[in-house]
Amino acid sequence: MKKILNLFVISAFLSISSAAFAQNVKPAATKPSVATLPNGASSLTETYGLWSVNCGIQDGNKICIMLRQEVNEQDRVLLSMSVSLDGEGTVSGNLTIPFGILVSKPIRLHVDDSKSVIESNVRTCVPAGCVVPIVFDKNFVGSLRAGKQLKLSMTVAAPGEPTLDNLFVQLDGFSNALKRLTSLQK
């Protein structure tokens, strides 16, 4: 009788524990979809006028930027500009400008001879130059799309604090590059 009782307790325990295990079984997690580029490529570089669009897959995420570098006669990079889009479609970027700029004064940006100006400050300096973060509003993006040059004006860190206003980023191809960047981000 005691054996039957023990057998009954053990079977009850096993049936309860197997039911408990059955309830705790989680369905196999579905893998998140991995970002892809056209034709299954792992990286992509395309040229639109003077701008390039570069994309790559990093940790399963698609990362794309637009890039333009302005060089001098010796092919040394004077300044560069990268542009990206966030999840809401906000256009932002970074300028890398030469050393010797008074970092306590803003960098002023305007397209061609427009009176619309964006000001931003140097964020940090790295071996390539000083980095200036920029966020463009929709009106300024429209000006960039239609313009010929993004002109920069800054103060030189020199006696008398002269203005340096002959640096610019050429915008030939900007509009098509931004259109492609937008389509790649989807």
Curated annotation (Swiss-Prot):
The keyword Plastid does not apply. Keywords: Signal, Virulence. InterPro entries: IalB_sf, Invasion_prot_B. Residues 1-22 form the signal peptide. Belongs to the IalB family. Required with NudH/IalA for erythrocytes invasion. This is Invasion protein B. It comes from Bartonella bacilliformis (strain ATCC 35685 / KC583 / Herrer 020/F12,63).
